[in-house]
Amino acid sequence: MSSRKVRVKKLNVKTTLPVLREDQIDPNEYEALTTDNQIATGVEQAEENEYHLQTILKEAGTSNDQEIPVPPPQESDINYDDLYPVPFHKPSSYIRFSQTVEECITCLYDMTTEDDEFLKQYNSKPPATGVLSEDDFEHIMEVFEDTAAEQTPFAAVDNTVAAYDMMLPGLTHLNQSVSTDVLQHAKPVYEYWKSRRQEAGNKPLHPSLKFETHQETDDTDPFVCFRRREARQTRKTRARDNKIAETLKKLRRELEDGRQLVLLAYEREMVKREVMSMDRAIFEERARLKDMKLRLGIKGEDEDLVNQKPQKRKPVEPPVVRQPTGAHLRQPVRSDGRTLDADLVLLSDKLAEKETELRLDIEMKVQNHRKWNQNHIDLTREPLSPVKEQGTEVKFRQAKTQYLMTPPASTSSEMEVDEIAPDAMQLDKRESSVFQFTAGSGEQSKGSQPAFRRRIGRLNRLWIDRRGMVTPPRELGEDRSDRWKYDSDSDDEEPPVYEVDPFDTRALKFRATIPLNPYMFRGRPAVPPEAVAAAQAQAGNRVLPSPAAAAAHAHAQAHAQAAAAAHLAAQAQAKAQAVAQQQAQAAQGV
C-alpha cells in the first residue's frame, strides 16, 4: 500500500466540509486513514518500510509503559471562608452597563403600520376583558421577540418557530408587572406574530444588526456587519524581531525617563515645601523680634528683619609667586662649564646643512658628467646648464615704457634688444594718496601685464614670445551660434581649470601644431606669388654651417665648460674652507 503524500491545505471559513454519519464512512478509506504508513516519519519514501522504523512506530502506538510524571494534588491549608466573607457584594467601582432612561423603563419594540391595522381590527370586536392598548401590545410583542431570540437563535437558518408554551414564562412575568390581564390577549397576538415572522423569513421583526449567515449570499450584501475574515499568519523574520525588541527597549527607556522625571519633580516640590516652611518660620520669628523691640523700646537698624540681597563673592586670586631679582638669577651650567643652550640644535642650522650637502652632491655629479664627456664634442646648444644661485627664473621680462620729452637720441634708436630698459621718469610715478583701494594682490596685477622673450630658433631665426596679451573678441556667426544652444548659464557649477605648464615640451609641441586664427590675417595685404617664390628660393639656398664654423663653435663651447668647471671648483674649495673654520671654532669653544 502506497503512502498518501497529498499536502492538506489549511482550513479557512470559506472551505466547504461534508458532514458524514458513522454509517456513511467507507471502511476501506477509514482503514487507509488510520494505517501506520500514514504517520509522518520524517524520512525518505524508500526508507519508510525499514524494519526497525516500523517496529518503533508500532510500539509507539501500543505501548503503555511510559508514564508522564504528574505531581499529586496537595490539600491547601488556606481557609478561604475565614478570610473572605460569604455575602459578596460587587463594588461600585466596577463598570456594569450604561443605558438611557428609555431603554431601562420603556419597551424596545415599536409598532408598525401593519401592527396598527391589526390592533384596530382586533379592538373592533373586543373580548369580554376589554380592549388591548398599544403599550400592552408592544410589551407582548417584545416578550415574543426576546423569547424567540433566546430559545431559537438560528431560526432563520433551520426555519424553527418557537411554540406558544415557550412564551408563557415571559407572559406570566409581564402579567405581574402590568395592571391589565395580558394573558387573555396573548393567544391572538401570538398567531399574528407567527404569521409576521413567516413572512419575514423567520427573522426578527425588531430591527437589529445583520450578521453574516451565508458566505455566498452575504458576501456582497452591504448591510452585513462584522464579516468573518481569515486571519493571515504573519511571517516572522529576524529583522522584525529586532525591530520589536528595539521598540520595547525604547518604550522601557521612555517609561524609565518619565519615572525619573516624576521622582525629580517630587523631590523638587518637597524642597520647595521645606523652603516655604523655613521662610514662614523666619517671618514669624522676625515679627516676634519686632514686637519685643517695640515692647522694650530698643531702637536700632532693622537690617536683620529684611532679606538682604547676597553680595557677589570676589574671585579668589591665585597667590603671586615672587621671582628673585636679576642679581640672584644664575643660568644653569654643566660640569664642564658650558651652558645648556650650547647643546640645542637650531632648525636653521639643520636646513643649512641639508642645503650644503645637496649643493655638494649636485656639484659632484656635474664634475663627473664633465669627466665622462671630456673626449667628446657635443654640438648641441647649452648641453649642461650651470647651477644658478638664485634658482631657475623664466627669461620673460616686463615691457617698461617711458615718456620722452624730446625726440629720441641716436643712443635710444641704436639700443640693443636685450638691454635693460632705463627706469621710468618721475612723470610716470603717481603720488601716493592717503586712501588707496586695490582690486587684488600685486601678483595678479603683475601677471596681467604683457611680457616678451627673445629666442633664436633654427637657421638663426629670431623669435619673440609674448605673454599676457589681450585676446581679441570672437565674432559669432550663424555657424557658431548653435554651439552654445544647450549650455546653461548657471553659476553653481564652475568650469574645470586644468593646470598646464606652458614651457613643457609636450605643451610647446601641441601649440606649434595649432593653426593660426583667421583674425591674425585680417587687414593684411595679399602676398604676391613672386615674393613667395623668392622666399622659397632663398630658404632653399640655406644649408648647415661649414665644418670650420662647427669646429670653432666646439672649441668655444669647451673653453666655456672649462671656465665653468674652474669656477665651480673655486666655489667648492671656498665652502670647504668655511666649513673647516666653523669646525675649528667649535673645537676651540669646547
Curated annotation (Swiss-Prot):
InterPro entries in the record: Enhancer_polycomb, Enhancer_polycomb-like_N
Keyword Nucleus among UniProt keywords: yes
Alphabetical keyword list: Cell cycle, DNA damage, DNA repair, Nucleus, Transcription, Transcription regulation
GO cellular component: NuA4 histone acetyltransferase complex; nucleus
Superkingdom of source: Eukaryota
Compositionally biased spans, kind Basic and acidic residues: 475-488
Keyword rRNA-binding part of the UniProt annotation: no
GO BP annotations, alphabetical order: DNA repair; regulation of transcription by RNA polymerase II
Location in the cell: Nucleus
Region (Disordered): 302-335, 471-497
Stated role: Component of the NuA4 histone acetyltransferase complex which is involved in transcriptional activation of selected genes principally by acetylation of nucleosomal histone H4 and H2A. The NuA4 complex is also involved in DNA repair. Involved in gene silencing by neighboring heterochromatin, blockage of the silencing spreading along the chromosome, and required for cell cycle progression through G2/M.
Quaternary organization: Component of the NuA4 histone acetyltransferase complex.
The family this protein is said to belong to: Belongs to the enhancer of polycomb family.
Protein name (Swiss-Prot/TrEMBL): Enhancer of polycomb-like protein 1
Origin species: Gibberella zeae (strain ATCC MYA-4620 / CBS 123657 / FGSC 9075 / NRRL 31084 / PH-1)
Biological classification of the source: Eukaryota, Fungi, Dikarya, Ascomycota, Pezizomycotina
Gene name linked to the record: EPL1
